A protein has these predicted regions:
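Residues that define the transmembrane beta-barrel architecture of outer-membrane proteins
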Residues: 50-55, 62, 102-106, 130-134, ...
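Transmembrane beta-strands of outer-membrane beta-barrel proteins
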Residues: 2-8, 68, 119-122, 147-149, ...
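Outer-membrane beta-barrel strand-turn architecture
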Residues: 53, 62-65, 114-116, 140-144, ...
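Detector for outer-membrane/organellar transmembrane beta-barrel domains
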Residues: 166-242
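Transmembrane beta-strand segments that form the barrel wall of outer-membrane beta-barrel proteins
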Residues: 92-94, 114, 118-128, 134-138, ...
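Outer membrane beta-barrel
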Residues: 2-118
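Residues on the lipid-exposed face of transmembrane beta-strands in outer-membrane beta-barrel proteins
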Residues: 1, 56-61, 108-112, 136-140, ...
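Transmembrane beta-strands of outer-membrane beta-barrel pores
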Residues: 8-14, 63-65, 72-76, 124-128, ...
Length: 242
């Protein structure tokens, strides 16, 4: 069977920020995907602008346990809630909460489901600079936990390998993700980067829900953040999550 999906976001932005921030128009219309022309400003004036962006544009084919999706889509391999080192394709800032729809990738995704609790995937995306991110992914359930393993290449520049799991300990939810990244150039002479997150959650009898999460980013010293703005507006990748 075939399916298709389209989702468009339209924004009218008005205020002093548009006028006082000279590069704000370019920032709003910036799209890092291969199909970057799907985002543009329809109207640009001194104090307001009108922006449109195609969030999703895909075709999907299903035959038995096999599925293929082509186009702008969300590829979510995360297990934890706030920071997702395993989410190679759609990294996003947790502080960017003004829009519930998460970013998509311009990609081809192959999916196979051997059983109800297992899945194998292969995904390839191309960004605006024609850099390729490609990875394989396998998920299974064992010992009461959901386990996942992945490996691939990030933006034609780095090898990646990772794993994650989610389950519970004494009734409390427990999830972890870890990804190791190493440059493909001078592979033997360079050190890699470890990204890891851990999350714990618990719901009490009175429905009070508590959740805690921590994150380690081995790339932090190389991010050179001078302010919160320099973090918030920089291109998001799995290495710039913190």
């Amino acid at each position: 069977s075939f399916r298709a999906g389209v989702s468009v976001r339209n924004r009218f932005i008005y205020g002093d920020l548009v006028e006082s921030f000279p590069s704000y128009n370019d920032l709003i219309s910036r799209d890092y995907g291969y199909l970057h022309k799907l985002t543009r400003n329809l109207v640009e004036e001194d104090s307001y602008l009108v922006n449109t962006s195609v969030d999703r544009l895909w075709m999907h084919y299903t035959r038995g346990s096999f599925e293929v999706r082509i186009g702008r889509q969300r590829i979510n391999w995360g297990q934890t809630y706030v920071w997702n080192p395993n989410d190679l394709f759609n990294a996003y800032s947790f502080f960017d909460f003004d829009y519930e729809e998460k970013p998509g990738s311009d990609a081809i995704r192959l999916m196979y489901y051997p059983s109800y609790t297992s899945a194998a995937e292969l995904a390839v995306k191309v960004n605006r600079d024609e850099q390729v991110t490609a990875a394989g992914y396998y998920r299974m359930n064992k010992w009461g936990y959901d386990w996942q393993f992945l490996a691939g290449i990030l933006n034609d520049e780095e090898y990646v390998a990772g794993m994650g799991w989610s389950g519970d300990i004494a009734g409390a939810g427990f999830s972890c993700e870890a990804t190791y990244i190493r440059p493909d150039k001078n592979f033997r002479d360079t050190s890699g980067i470890l990204l890891a997150s851990a999350s714990a959650s618990y719901m009490f009898d009175n429905s009070l829900y508590l959740q805690m999460e921590g994150f380690y980013n081995g790339n932090y010293e190389h991010m050179r953040l001078g302010s919160f703005r320099s973090y918030y507006y920089r291109p998001m990748t799995v290495k710039t999550l913190s």
